[in-house]
C-alpha cells in the first residue's frame, strides 16, 4: 500500500502530465499529451519554437472596421463559430471552430497559387508527403503532443498497487511508445532527402514541397503556469531547398524576394507585407515575413538557412550518402526552410480586401457598402447567376445551362437562381459583395428574346449588357489577366 506522501507525489506527477491534455478523457478515445522539459542534449528545435508559436501578446483593439469584417466573415461563412470563439488570439493561434465553406474555398485557392508558384512552374522541386503522427523517441525538451489511449491511461492511474516510481515509469513508457503529432513539415521532407537525391542524379540544388496541417501547443499562463490550454492547428506550406553551402546565402536572398513578391501580388495594399532579418540562438540566419494587421504586425512566413545540422542529425553515421554534386565536388548540402502559414495568410487577405464605401443605393450617408475585394485568383466564387423578370422555369433552365458551362471551364459559380425567397437587387448585390463574388449575372426575359444578360462588377459596381455566348470567354480572360499581373 502506498503512503500518503507517495499518493500526493503521484497526484503531482499526474497533474503535470495531464496539463497537456487536449480535452476530456473518454473511454477508448485518443488523448493528447505534451512533454515540456528544459532543452538538453541533441534536441533539434522545431520551427514552432523558432517562430514563437502559441503566444500572442495583447494588442490594442482594432476598431469598428475589424468588428464589421468579423461579422461579415461569420454571416457569409468564411469563418465558423460564435463571436466569442473568434477572438483575435484564437484566430492567430489556430484555436477556433474552423472555416466555413467560403473560407475553405479561399484557403484552397491560396494553396493552389502557392503550389503553382513554388512547384508547378519551377525546375527541380518535387512534391512529398508525410504522416501526421508517428512513433518517436521521447527527447528532453520535446514539446510535441502525443496520442495516448484514454483507456490505457485510466488503467494505469487506477492501479492502486503501483508505487510512485512504478507509476512514473509506466507513464513515461506510454509516452515513448505513443505517436506524436507533427509540429512542422521540415522533418517529413528531410526523411525523403536521400531517396529524392537519386531522382535528381545527386545534382544540387533541388527542393521538396508539401502542404499540410501541423499542431502546436497554445499556453495559458493566466490559469496554469507553464500549462497547456489547447492545441492549435495551422495549414503550412513548406519548401525545403537543398543547396550547396557556397550558394546558400544567395538562395536565401532569392527565396526571400520571391516570397515577399508573391504575398504582395494578391494584395490591395502590398506595402502591408514586409520582411525583417532574424537569427536563432545558434547563430543561423533567416528572414521573417509579416502582415500589418490593424493591431500590429503578425508573422505569416519564415525562411531559415539551417546549414547541414538537421541532415547530419537525422542521418548519423554514413555521411557519404548525404553527398550531392556541386559541379565536380561532393558536398553535404545546406538546408533552407521556407515555411508559410496559409491560415494566417488567408486572414491577412480578408483584412486587406475589406472596404467600406458609400452605398450608392441609399441616400443615407451613414450607411456604407461593405465589400471584400479579394484578388480574382483568390475569390472563392467568381460569378453569381440570378434570374430577373420573366418566366421562372425558362430562366432557370438558361441559368442551369450557363452554370454547367462555366463549371466545366473551371469557373466557380453561385446558383442564386435556386433561391426561393425574393430579394431586391440592392440586397443581392450587398450579399454578393460581402461574399467577394466578382460578377453578378442577371438572366431576364430579354435574354430569352435576344440572348443579352445583365453583368454587374463587384469592384466598379458598373453594369453592362453582354451576349450570353461571350460570358465564358470574358470571365476566363479576366481571371487569366489578373493572374498574370
From Swiss-Prot:
GO biological process terms, alphabetically, are: DNA-templated DNA replication; in utero embryonic development; mitochondrial DNA replication; positive regulation of DNA-directed DNA polymerase activity
The effect annotated for residue 182 to W is:
In MTDPS16; decreased function in mitochondrial DNA replication; decreased protein stability; no effect on DNA binding
Region listing for Disordered, in residue ranges:
28-65
**Which residues get modified to Phosphoserine?**
38
Assembly: Heterotrimer composed of a catalytic subunit and a homodimer of accessory subunits (POLG:POLG2).
Implicated disorder: Progressive external ophthalmoplegia with mitochondrial DNA deletions, autosomal dominant, 4: A disorder characterized by progressive weakness of ocular muscles and levator muscle of the upper eyelid. In a minority of cases, it is associated with skeletal myopathy, which predominantly involves axial or proximal muscles and which causes abnormal fatigability and even permanent muscle weakness. Ragged-red fibers and atrophy are found on muscle biopsy. A large proportion of chronic ophthalmoplegias are associated with other symptoms, leading to a multisystemic pattern of this disease. Mitochondrial DNA depletion syndrome 16, hepatic type: An autosomal recessive disorder characterized by poor feeding, difficulty breathing, abdominal distention, an abnormal carnitine profile, metabolic acidosis and hepatic failure in the neonatal period. Severe mtDNA depletion is observed in liver and muscle biopsies.
What's the protein name? DNA polymerase subunit gamma-2
The source organism is Homo sapiens
- Phylogenetic classification of the source organism: Eukaryota, Metazoa, Chordata, Craniata, Vertebrata
Amino acid at each position: 500500500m502506498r503512503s500518503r506522501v507517495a499518493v500526493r507525489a503521484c497526484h503531482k506527477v499526474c497533474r503535470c502530465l495531464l496539463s497537456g491534455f487536449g480535452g476530456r478523457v473518454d473511454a477508448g478515445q485518443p488523448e493528447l499529451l505534451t512533454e515540456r522539459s528544459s532543452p538538453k542534449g541533441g534536441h533539434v528545435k522545431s520551427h514552432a519554437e523558432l517562430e514563437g508559436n502559441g503566444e500572442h501578446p495583447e494588442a490594442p483593439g482594432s476598431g469598428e472596421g475589424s468588428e464589421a469584417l468579423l461579422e461579415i466573415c461569420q454571416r457569409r461563412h468564411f469563418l465558423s463559430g460564435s463571436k466569442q470563439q473568434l477572438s483575435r488570439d484564437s484566430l492567430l493561434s489556430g484555436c477556433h471552430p474552423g472555416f466555413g465553406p467560403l473560407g475553405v474555398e479561399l484557403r484552397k485557392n491560396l494553396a493552389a497559387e502557392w503550389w503553382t508558384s513554388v512547384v508547378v512552374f519551377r525546375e527541380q522541386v518535387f512534391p512529398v508527403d508525410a504522416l501526421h503522427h508517428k512513433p518517436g523517441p521521447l527527447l528532453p525538451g520535446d514539446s510535441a503532443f502525443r496520442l495516448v489511449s484514454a483507456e490505457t491511461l485510466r488503467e494505469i492511474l487506477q492501479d492502486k498497487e503501483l508505487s510512485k516510481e512504478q507509476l512514473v515509469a509506466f507513464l513515461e513508457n506510454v509516452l515513448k511508445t505513443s505517436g506524436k503529432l507533427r509540429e512542422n513539415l521540415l522533418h517529413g521532407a528531410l526523411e525523403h532527402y536521400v531517396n529524392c537525391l537519386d531522382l535528381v542524379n545527386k545534382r544540387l540544388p533541388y527542393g521538396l514541397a508539401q502542404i499540410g496541417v501541423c499542431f502546436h501547443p497554445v499556453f495559458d499562463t493566466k490559469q496554469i503556469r507553464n500549462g497547456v490550454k489547447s492545441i492549435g492547428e495551422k495549414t503550412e506550406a513548406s519548401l525545403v531547398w537543398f543547396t550547396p553551402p557556397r550558394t546558400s546565402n544567395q538562395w536565401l536572398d532569392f527565396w526571400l524576394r520571391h516570397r515577399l513578391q508573391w504575398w504582395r501580388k494578391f494584395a490591395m495594399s502590398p506595402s502591408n507585407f514586409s520582411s525583417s532579418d532574424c537569427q536563432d540562438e545558434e547563430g543561423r540566419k533567416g528572414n521573417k515575413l509579416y502582415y500589418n494587421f490593424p493591431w500590429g504586425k503578425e508573422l505569416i512566413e519564415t525562411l531559415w538557412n539551417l546549414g547541414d545540422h538537421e541532415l547530419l542529425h537525422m542521418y548519423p553515421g554514413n555521411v557519404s550518402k548525404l553527398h550531392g554534386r556541386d559541379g565536380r565536388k561532393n558536398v553535404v548540402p545546406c538546408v533552407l526552410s521556407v515555411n508559410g502559414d496559409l491560415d494566417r495568410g488567408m486572414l491577412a487577405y480578408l483584412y486587406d480586401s475589406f472596404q467600406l464605401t458609400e452605398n450608392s443605393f441609399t441616400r443615407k450617408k451613414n450607411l456604407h457598402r461593405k465589400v471584400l475585394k479579394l484578388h480574382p485568383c483568390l475569390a472563392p466564387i467568381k460569378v453569381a447567376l440570378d434570374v430577373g423578370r420573366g418566366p421562372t422555369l425558362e430562366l432557370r433552365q438558361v441559368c442551369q445551362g450557363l452554370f454547367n458551362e462555366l463549371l466545366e471551364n473551371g469557373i466557380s459559380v453561385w446558383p442564386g437562381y435556386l433561391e426561393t425567397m425574393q430579394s431586391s437587387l440592392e440586397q443581392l448585390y450587398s450579399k454578393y459583395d460581402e461574399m467577394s463574388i466578382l460578377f453578378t449575372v442577371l438572366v431576364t426575359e430579354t435574354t430569352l428574346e435576344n440572348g443579352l444578360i445583365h453583368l454587374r462588377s463587384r469592384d466598379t459596381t458598373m453594369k453592362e449588357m453582354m451576349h450570353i455566348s461571350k460570358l465564358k470567354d470574358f470571365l476566363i480572360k479576366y481571371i487569366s489577366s489578373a493572374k498574370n499581373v
